[in-house]
């Protein structure tokens, strides 16, 4: 066998090297040292950045949430049992992104954009948005000027919400917080059905953070029944999902909502609820060995909510005039709104709707305490017809609450005070409203106009709900034309004639 000379070997190697045309990929690769409770400790990710997405050998993704000289702490978004000690980890060079677009409407997805409803893969997305982005600046915004109708009389009349506002829904468990958010989503159907273009519609996102799977299923079922699923995205994380996924959920959903906002459309997002989100972040921070502060929350727990809620905005006309309205939900313990997380979120938002368990158990639903609830910017978005009625309502209810305190102690009241007390009781009855029965603005104005008029003084307090149902039925059947022009034209006197006529015949 003849030997091969070294010159020939060098020649062959030189030819191979010169003809090599394959792509060369340079990257930072590390090795998993340990995995525990959704946190992986990785060695060797040189040049990696804080918040950068990494890919494990199993395909699971994670985000770098802690950096030391040679060690990185990675939060795993998925099942940590799929990540093993010794697995390779590769930096992607990108921040966390989620799919966005119209194809997500009507679907139930995870915070990573994966379908959870069993209806197959999601195709035709309009791209991807980063989960963490800077909130719009001062010059990128404009004042809230358009109303967002909830269909709930107490809110639309007394605590109005505008497009681009952040309105907190706060109260004890089982007081109807989610019910208010769902009614608001369902009420958008009447406006979306008659919208002239896509830019006139209000798209909705419901974010379930650490909720029971049965509760999420009930919400999805109700949205489908009401025909609201077509314009709604449900981003779901159950109580059994990993803590990092629960933490990621509101940011991912906000990125999906920003697609509509940045394209000149309107979006409503419900965070249900941020109390569980704060607990998930506390758990994650303790696992990352960050120093605990008050109630064992880390020092930046305020910042995680402020940077999320500041992304809700009404953009300037130069940027398309789109809006993202946020309805965060906070659960209190025994009505204590002075606790750490509630006070944080109250200070970030533009107002709060406060629900009381005492009112709920008395049968006043929605159980909104009008005295403690406030909307700091929404009144600028109210239409004229609503403002006229709402102004007198606020005064009547304030006088009623003051007189009620006197009456409770058995104080003698004169005839005018007694009449005011009776009027307040009737007004309170008219503010009651069943769940999943939102009213149009015209219907709300008609009911509240009746409540402020003396024509109802002869009707017993217990019959006010029946009176309201009868009045609305009559207006829908016999006076549809009057209702249609109620907001544009001054037809208040004509409407009062109809109301007084019905009150006499009731």
UniProtKB/Swiss-Prot annotation:
Positions with a binding annotation for ATP: 171-178
Protein name per UniProt: ATP synthase subunit alpha
What's this chain's function? Answer: Produces ATP from ADP in the presence of a proton gradient across the membrane. The alpha chain is a regulatory subunit.
Q: Which GO terms describe its molecular function?
A: ADP binding; ATP binding; proton-transporting ATP synthase activity, rotational mechanism
Show the catalytic activity: ATP + H2O + 4 H(+)(in) = ADP + phosphate + 5 H(+)(out)
According to its UniProt entry, this protein's organism is Anaplasma phagocytophilum (strain HZ)
InterPro entries referenced in this protein's UniProt entry, alphabetically: ATP_synth_asu-like_sf, ATP_synth_asu_C, ATP_synth_asu_C_sf, ATP_synth_F1_a_nt-bd_dom, ATP_synth_F1_asu, ATPase_a/bsu_AS, ATPase_F1/V1/A1_a/bsu_N, ATPase_F1/V1/A1_a/bsu_N_sf
For whether the record's keyword set contains Cell membrane, the answer is yes
- Keyword list, A-Z: ATP synthesis, ATP-binding, Cell inner membrane, Cell membrane, CF(1), Hydrogen ion transport, Ion transport, Membrane, Nucleotide-binding, Translocase, Transport
Kindly report the protein's main subcellular placement as a broad class: membrane
Q: Which EC number applies? A: 7.1.2.2
Per its UniProt entry, what is the enzyme's top EC class, as one word? translocase
Using the record, list the residue span of the signal peptide; answer none if the entry has no such feature: none
